[in-house]
């Protein structure tokens, strides 16, 4: 798969704007500011194709990228407390609409900040994916921020316990800084879209 040929296609502010498509899709989900854009940029081998922000709640649209005939779908981040109720409602409608509309979703890449235990929202999202039968992996972002080996190992082991319903080989530590886990993420993506 030619990740370096990735192109931004379009952004949609409501579910009803989404065009129908039978192209295979890889969806990226996670809390606001968890590092979805950083992971996408690392995959695309670009600095800023996906906009990175230090402001939580920045991605409020569903963003589509074309990668070799596969849609990479950057879903809006959830769980940011300062977002107005109307925005939370719009987010819920977009997510529900996206996942319940018979799209050709091959894999969901669920991102969780490795420095902290998964939140209630993270667990709810993963349970939803499991109950609805979507294939998913969990990418533990910001692994490079855990400087001490002991802290890193403990956090990873605790995460595996906290997400015991996820197969351990599907929990992948990732760093946008040093590239840890990137090749493993690519292998899973390629496994589900056929290379």
Protein language model annotation of sequence segments:
Residues 58, 70, 77-80, 115-117, ...:
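Conserved nucleotide-binding/hydrolysis micro-motifs of P-loop NTPases
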Residues 1-80, 194:
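Conserved G1/Walker A P-loop phosphate-binding module
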Residues 88-92, 119-123, 153, 179-182:
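Amphipathic alpha-helical transducer elements in NTP-driven molecular machines
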Residues 67-105:
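Conserved nucleotide-sensing/catalytic segment adjacent to the nucleotide-binding pocket
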Residues 96-169:
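Conserved C-terminal guanine-recognition region of P-loop GTPase G domains, centered on the G4
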Residues 3-15, 145-195:
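Canonical P-loop GTPase G-domain recognition
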């Amino acid at each position: 798969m030619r990740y370096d040929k990735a192109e931004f296609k379009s952004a949609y502010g409501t579910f009803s704007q989404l065009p129908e498509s039978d192209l295979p899709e890889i969806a990226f989900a996670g809390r606001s500011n968890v590092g979805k854009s950083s992971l996408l940029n690392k995959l695309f081998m670009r600095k800023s194709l996906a906009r990175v922000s230090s402001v939580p709640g920045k991605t409020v649209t569903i963003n589509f990228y074309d990668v070799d005939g596969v849609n990479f779908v950057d879903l809006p981040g959830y769980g940011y407390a300062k977002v107005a109720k109307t925005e939370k409602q719009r987010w819920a409608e977009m997510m529900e609409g996206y996942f319940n509309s018979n799209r050709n979703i091959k894999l969901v890449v669920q991102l969780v900040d490795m420095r902290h235990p998964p939140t209630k929202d993270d667990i709810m999202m993963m349970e939803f994916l499991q109950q609805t039968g979507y294939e998913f992996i969990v990418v533990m972002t910001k692994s490079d921020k855990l400087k001490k080996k002991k802290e890193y190992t403990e956090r990873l082991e605790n995460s595996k316990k906290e997400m015991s319903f996820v197969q351990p080989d599907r929990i992948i530590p990732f760093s946008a800084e040093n590239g840890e886990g990137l090749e493993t993420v690519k292998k899973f993506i390629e496994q589900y879209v056929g290379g």
